[in-house]
């Protein structure tokens, strides 16, 4: 199993967004799915905030695109769809909670035929997961990408903890 991560290089977490994320992590630890999503469009600071969290918790940020794609290379298309949940679980099981995930776009690949939110919820049953989500909350729905995009999704987040990132990193649900 290849370990793919981004080293933490920023200062410790402080400020309103960091407090909200800490509260979301604490809340998630008592839920069935221990999942916190940092939802925001590209450029809203999700990666930087994940690096801050990594530094505070002495952890690393896992680049899911790199970790998963390297494991899927040798598999057929059918095997990729079937094995992806197990491969994702194996990748995150190498790390202590909270497990920090960035660059999760591969989970949305239509060829893999997966439900990305359900995948993340599944791996968050036994560990706290904090993941970036390239989208937003709108009318109670968790959106990924924009309407018309091939990977567009609109999901009911259930009790998943959502921290909305708006570019200034101060908005929260």
Which residues are covered by each model-predicted region?
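N-terminal pre-Walker A segment at the start of P-loop NTPase domains
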Residues: 2-29
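Walker A/P-loop nucleotide-binding motif
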Residues: 32-48
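Conserved P-loop NTPase "ATPase switch" module shared by AAA+ and STAND
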Residues: 94-112
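Hydrophobic positions on the alpha1 helix immediately C-terminal to the Walker A/P-loop
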Residues: 49, 53
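Post-Walker A helix-loop "phosphate-sensing" segment adjacent to the P-loop in P-loop NTPases
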Residues: 54-62
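Residue-level preference for the first positions of well-ordered beta-strands
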Residues: 34-37, 98-100, 128-130
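Short glycine-rich substrate-engagement loop in P-loop NTPases that contacts/grips substrate
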Residues: 64-92
